[in-house]
């Protein structure tokens, strides 16, 4: 039976096996179970002896891969993978995955961290960033057979290594430092056309605003190569060692992996976890008070900026030695406000991915949400009312200045329509806060 060995940095963790019937099983290595660095690969795959055969095995590894069937088909075509199943795809592109996971054939070992790369010229960088237009997945251009990465999510993206001011393609098992996101483009729906051609600018703006309001988000910058404009987001699952000679992978997983769920149920409306389940889970965090506070604060932020994609795969935890965990920075934040009007969507169509408590059922429609719904949710969750009031009051006080500060920090060629659309609607919803909490 074919096997893939799972590594965390240079530590052998266990073996992923694909059975004859297509099922996936996982077994922790004895030396990993005995190691002082031992931690579960996933909180849905607790440390234990023997084979783990639950659905959580398939779902954990499947969630390391891009969501899009189109991108998966490109991987099959590019590397002649046997199928679209996780084992077969990760056999080809599992060298640098989300978190600390590296998957290698049985005959390959990692005795020490290796750092090797190829510096990219601007022309080569543009080639990597436009590879998807030629049906090449994740920027893995044909001339670079050694460049094999897996980046989860639905958006066109790749990952690259930043050395000083240079963008580089990593060689072998060398990690990447940044996720590189391309413009999403147009999404055609039955009743609307969503123009996300400015998604790079949109996400950059949202990350700046989140940081200005005290939320923990990764650093990001807009990069250009030829005619390509992309967003480079610093990976929080990577860290240089003290000497800055070796890049370490940090174990983490998203909430679908944590709960052993497939990505098909990442939305609460499809049966995935909502605020209550995640808040209950964060009670067990090594920084429970902070994480629960920050998570509730982020729910308010998503409402204010019209972020409709806050599903389970867009929240993650770091997995620490022994299996303790804590919340990672927030990520993948885009406002839907620039999509309003024209052939786009109406404000009444915008809904949060996770519902808030209301007098009757759940409230998801962004334009129908008021501060009272956050307070009602906090009450159901037994989240301290005084802290929820504090969060709402802080946003009421901070929003106007934060918007001004972000606007003055933007590059001169930043699209004004993105700023106007987000700012106008944020201030409109902010009015609901300021009426109750005051704002000067």
PLM region spans:
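Phosphate/dinucleotide-binding and metal-coordinating scaffold of catalytic cores
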Residues: 1-312, 316-440
């Amino acid at each position: 039976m074919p096997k893939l060995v799972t590594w965390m940095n240079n530590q052998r963790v266990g073996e992923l096996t694909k059975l004859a019937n297509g099922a996936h099983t996982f077994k922790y290595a004895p030396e990993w179970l005995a190691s002082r660095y031992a931690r579960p690969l996933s909180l849905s795959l607790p440390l234990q002896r023997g084979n783990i055969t639950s659905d959580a095995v398939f779902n954990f590894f499947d969630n390391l891969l891009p969501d899009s069937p189109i991108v998966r088909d490109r991987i099959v075509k590019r590397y002649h993978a046997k199928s679209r199943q996780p084992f077969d795809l990760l056999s080809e592109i599992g060298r640098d995955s989300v978190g600390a996971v590296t998957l290698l054939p049985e005959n390959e070992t990692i005795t020490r961290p290796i750092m090797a790369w190829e510096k990219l010229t601007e022309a080569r960088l543009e080639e990597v960033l436009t590879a998807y237009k030629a049906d090449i997945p994740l920027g893995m251009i044909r001339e670079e057979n050694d460049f094999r990465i897996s980046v989860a999510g639905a958006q066109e993206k790749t990952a690259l290594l930043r050395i000083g001011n240079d963008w580089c393609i990593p060689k072998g098992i060398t990690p990447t430092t940044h996720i590189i996101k391309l413009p999403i483009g147009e999404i055609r729906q039955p009743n609307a056309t969503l123009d996300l051609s400015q998604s790079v600018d949109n996400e950059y703006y949202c990350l700046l605003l989140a940081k200005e309001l005290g939320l923990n988000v990764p650093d990001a910058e807009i990069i250009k190569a030829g005619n390509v404009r992309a967003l480079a987001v610093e990976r929080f699952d990577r860290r240089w060692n003290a000497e800055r000679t070796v890049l370490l992978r940090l174990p983490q997983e998203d909430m679908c992996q944590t709960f052993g769920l497939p990505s098909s149920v990442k939305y609460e409306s499809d049966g995935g976890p909502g605020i209550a389940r995640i808040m209950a889970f964060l009670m067990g965090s090594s920084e429970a008070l902070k994480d629960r506070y920050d998570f509730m604060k982020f729910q308010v932020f998503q409402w204010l900026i019209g972020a409709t994609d806050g599903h389970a795969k867009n929240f993650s935890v770091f997995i620490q030695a022994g299996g303790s965990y804590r919340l990672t920075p927030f990520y993948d934040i885009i406002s839907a406000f620039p999509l309003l009007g024209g052939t786009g969507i109406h404000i009444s169509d915008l809904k949060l991915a996770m519902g808030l408590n209301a007098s009757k059922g759940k409230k998801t429609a962004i334009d129908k949400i008021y501060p009272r719904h956050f307070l009602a949710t906090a009450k159901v969750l037994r989240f301290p009312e005084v802290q929820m009031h504090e969060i709402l009051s802080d946003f009421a006080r901070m929003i106007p200045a934060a918007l001004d500060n972000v606007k003055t920090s933007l590059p001169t060629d930043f699209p004004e329509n993105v700023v106007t659309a987000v700012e106008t609607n944020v201030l409109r919803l902010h009015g609901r806060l300021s009426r109750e909490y005051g704002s000067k």
